From Swiss-Prot:
Protein name per UniProt: Large ribosomal subunit protein uL23cz/uL23cy
SUPFAM superfamilies recorded: Ribosomal proteins S24e, L23 and L15e (SSF54189)
Family: Belongs to the universal ribosomal protein uL23 family.
GO CC terms, sorted: chloroplast; ribonucleoprotein complex; ribosome
Record keywords: Chloroplast, Plastid, Ribonucleoprotein, Ribosomal protein, RNA-binding, rRNA-binding
Stored InterPro entries: Nucleotide-bd_a/b_plait_sf, Ribosomal_uL23-like, Ribosomal_uL23/eL15/eS24_sf, Ribosomal_uL23_CS
Subcellular location: Plastid, Chloroplast
Length: 93
């Protein structure tokens, strides 16, 4: 499934990790139930709440036409106490 694009690490998302809430950007066409099912299946955790919001669009000018580049939304996933998602790290060479 390619609904989840990547995890987000901002000041707010790092603060929310203490409350067992994980933040990621997802495709705008994905539904909450799809993302919830995928997270529970892939990571083996229990999701109790999901919040999402659209980020402000960024404009990109192509000649006289103004286009927008943001085609995703941010999802905050709250897990049941006792569950956690291991950090996703890239292996450095």
């Amino acid at each position: 499934m390619d609904g989840i694009k990547y995890a987000v690490f901002t000041d707010k998302s790092i603060r929310l990790l203490g409350k067992n809430q994980y933040t990621s950007n997802v495709e705008s066409g994905s539904t909450r139930t799809e993302i919830k099912h995928w997270v529970e299946l892939f990571f083996g955790v229990k999701v109790i709440a999901m919040n999402s919001h659209q980020l402000p669009r960024k404009g990109r000018r192509m000649g006289p036409i103004m286009a927008h580049t943001m085609h995703y939304r941010r999802m905050i996933i709250t897990l049941q106490p006792g569950y956690s998602i291991p950090p996703l790290r890239k292996k450095r060479t």
